[in-house]
A protein has these predicted regions:
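Alpha-helical transmembrane segments and their helix-helix packing motifs
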Residues: 1-268
Length: 268
């Protein structure tokens, strides 16, 4: 039932490992692109919601954030949160090793960070209207995220990436417009529910840092958020999705390494 999709994920893990090993610059550029694409989505949703009544903000923000994952998947780039799922399937299927997985994940995260900060810098240099005003939703949301309790961030991170990886998983199981519908629904649920995505937070934090933020907003708070959200994102991508669908597949139907072709799939 899930064998074909797992095969695609494991083959993509092998592609990611080859790209990282054979073309490190290309891998870092592609990772930065993913961070930038998610950042563009963050700028969009905060621009749209800044002047809205708080009661409708979650719906508007959720309904428009689908652009972020659409850009990542359709344009092609390397997103940390998607890699947590892809690389887990790769390890279980034997297309990559544990060592490769744990070497690639931090590189992807750092590459995403570069792209996220770069987009925030461009927005700031372009006179970003959200940044100079200390009452902007960017500053209030960023501060709230950096002061939230660790376990709240961890579990919100887990719920978030469960939805993100489900969106990616479903794009591999559908064709045509159904891919976009899957992305839209999952990201609507993630944003409207107030969950935490480490890469999306990177651009938000950079935007607030470059603007007229509160003195209570600190680098230590940013690090606190990104640590716990990243761990939560990793849990759901690797365990809930990767191991979950692996063990949901009958043992006789699970793929083995020699079945993989080297066809590239959407990076996610």
């Amino acid at each position: 039932m899930f064998t074909d999709t797992i095969n695609k994920c494991a083959a993509n893990a092998a592609r990611i490992a080859r790209l990282s090993a054979n073309n490190p610059l290309g891998f870092w550029v592609s990772s930065a692109m993913a961070g930038a694409y998610v950042g563009l989505g963050i700028i969009l949703i905060f621009t749209l919601s800044n002047l809205l009544d708080p009661s409708v903000r979650p719906l508007v923000m959720g309904a428009t954030f689908g652009i972020a994952l659409t850009l990542v998947i359709i344009a092609g780039s390397e997103l940390f949160t998607g890699h947590t799922m892809f690389l887990t399937f790769g390890v279980k299927a034997g297309s990559i090793s544990h060592g490769q997985m744990w070497a690639i994940l931090p590189q992807t995260w750092l590459g995403n960070l570069v792209g996220s900060v770069f987009v925030a810098m461009l927005y700031s240099w372009g006179g970003g209207s959200l940044l100079p005003v200390d009452t902007s939703i960017v500053h209030s949301v960023a501060l709230a995220k950096t002061t939230a309790p660790a376990m709240v961030l961890f579990f919100k991170g887990a719920l978030c990436n469960w939805l993100v990886c489900l969106a990616i998983w479903m794009t591999l199981r559908t064709e045509g417009a159904a891919k976009f519908i899957a992305i839209w629904w999952c990201l609507l649920a993630f944003i409207a529910s107030g969950y935490e995505h480490s890469i999306a937070n990177m651009t938000l934090f950079a935007l607030s840092w470059f603007g007229n933020h509160s003195e209570a907003y600190t680098l230590a708070g940013i690090g606190h958020n990104l640590l716990w959200v990243t761990l939560g994102n990793t849990l759901s991508g690797a365990v809930f999705m990767g191991l979950g669908y692996w063990y949901a597949t009958p043992k006789a139907n699970r793929p083995v390494a020699d079945k993989f072709n080297q066809t590239e799939t959407a990076a996610g």
